[in-house]
Amino acid sequence: GIRDRSPSRGLADVYKRQVLLLTIGAGGGLKQTLLDAGVSQTISKVAEGAHMPYLLLAWLIAVALRQATGSATVATTTTAGILAPMMAGLAATQSSLVALAIGAGSVFFCHVNDAGFWMVREYFGLQLKQTIWVWSVLQTIVSVVGLIGTLLLWHFLT
């Protein structure tokens, strides 16, 4: 602190927590803005007309929102809000698998419009191209494997 002239490590920890809370709060705020603006109703109407399997639909919407906003938090919360009315009649197992598909879609191809991309780049001291090849490709693999695993679970559990 100031009196003993020691570095204030505690302040750095508080700052990290504040940034995390602000990011989550901003993600929730953007989600609500998208819902209030009618984006969710438009996507729901298109989704209902697409006649797609629930898991693929959930994954694709989450991917689209992740790419548009750069935030996995926004992609997750907004996709869940959009699909909630359509998924109301699903069994608990099916709802859980839809949530997993949303989570998998929300991490698809992290790129320059995502704060996490820049954090990884700085933390590991990577160049932009390296970050795309390492982090973005890894995130895409995680997302696709997550979707495949969720589809397999749907096949065997429902």
Predicted regions: what is each one?
Residues 25-27, 50-90, 102-103:
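Hydrophobic alpha-helical transmembrane segments of multi-pass integral membrane proteins
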Residues 1-11, 15:
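Single conserved hydrophobic/aromatic residue that forms the stacking wall/gate
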Residues 105-158:
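Juxtamembrane and boundary regions of transmembrane helices in multi-pass small-molecule transporters
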Residues 12-24, 35, 52-54:
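Helical membrane-embedded segments and adjacent short helical loop/helix-boundary regions
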Residues 34-52:
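Membrane-interface interhelical connector segments
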Residues 3, 26-35:
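Structural signal for alpha-helical transmembrane segments and their membrane-water exit/capping regions
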Residues 55-60, 99, 132, 136, ...:
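Hydrophobic alpha-helical transmembrane segments
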Residues 65-69, 75-83, 95-128:
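Alpha-helical membrane segments and immediately flanking helix-loop junctions
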